[in-house]
Regions:
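One-carbon transfer enzymes
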Residues: 2-279
Length: 279
């Protein structure tokens, strides 16, 4: 589905509504696509369920296996690549956080979803029959990708009735790409933020639906990442509210000049040399 048709379709399906819509108006059906990110995702969902407006119905969550950007393969391949890229000490710290979160039920995504009564279904990929069947069963108005380190296949967007949007932890069009929090700290920037945009063929290139800024007051990536994840819930609600009211998205311009890719070893060395830390 192209960007121009996205907002038109949502309005045709639900119509613009005020902040507190009448109780008899059909709720907006939202499906979430994510990866089982072991750091801050459970907290993010916990906040989303706590603050969701009455007109929002979260009908299901599709969960794919977590894999850091640019690394695919066996667990051994993953560990070797992460150790080489980020250093063994940072890898061990990350492992300690992951194990600690796995041992605490409240920090597990599955626990949060079960307590909220929202069904979660695991998938290996989005362009398969299983995911297509789940989309048909849930029949969402909107699908949002959160903490999703993959590209949504174009065929999925083309064949979907739903509007697709993405949550990006950066101020688009600045720092497009898979590691916006890293690059904001790497470059010594003093503010970052969250952008929710329509999903397009161009990665992080869809029209902007909502955006909020936040001062960077901590040079540890994990702390900043958590703060932005929690802020992303508010920005997502802003975006969905705007679509329901018929607010036109803004153009995501200057795409070619704003792309930042996966950090290389030299970038990580510079990141640390400037006083930043991962944990």
């Amino acid at each position: 589905m192209n960007e121009r048709l996205a907002a038109e379709q949502l309005l045709a399906a639900t119509g613009p509504v005020p902040d507190e819509p009448p109780r008899d108006k059909s709720p907006l059906r939202l499906m979430i696509v994510t990866e089982d990110e072991p750091f801050h995702l459970a907290e993010t969902f916990e906040k989303l369920f706590a603050v969701s407006p009455r007109w929002l119905d979260i009908v299901g969550v599709a969960v794919l296996a977590f894999a850091p950007v640019g690394i695919r393969g066996s667990r051994l391949t993953l560990l070797r690549a992460l150790g080489t890229r980020y250093g063994m000490s940072n890898l061990l710290r990350a492992a300690a956080v992951v194990v600690g979160n796995r041992l605490r039920p409240r920090r597990r995504l599955g626990t949060v979803l079960r307590q909220s009564g929202v069904a979660a279904t695991g998938f290996h990929k989005l362009d398969g029959e299983a995911f297509a069947a789940e989309m048909a069963r849930l029949d969402p108005d909107v699908v949002v990708t959160i903490a999703f380190n993959r590209i949504v296949p174009p065929i999925v967007l083309e064949e979907s009735r739903a509007i697709w949007m993405n949550v990006h932890l950066g101020l688009l069009p600045h720092n497009r790409g898979p590691a916006p929090v890293f690059w904001a700290l790497h470059d010594g920037e003093h503010e970052s933020g969250v952008t929710v945009h329509l999903t397009a063929d161009e990665v992080d290139g869809g029209a902007i639906l909502a955006q909020r800024r936040r001062a960077i007051d901590e040079r540890r990536l994990a702390v900043e990442h958590r703060a932005l994840r929690l802020l992303s819930v508010d920005v997502l609600i802003d975006a969905l509210t705007g679509l329901r009211k018929g607010v036109a998205p803004s153009r995501n311009s200057d795409l070619a000049a704003r792309w930042r890719g996966v950090p290389e070893t030299s970038h990580i060395a510079a990141f640390l040399a400037r006083g930043n830390r991962f944990f």
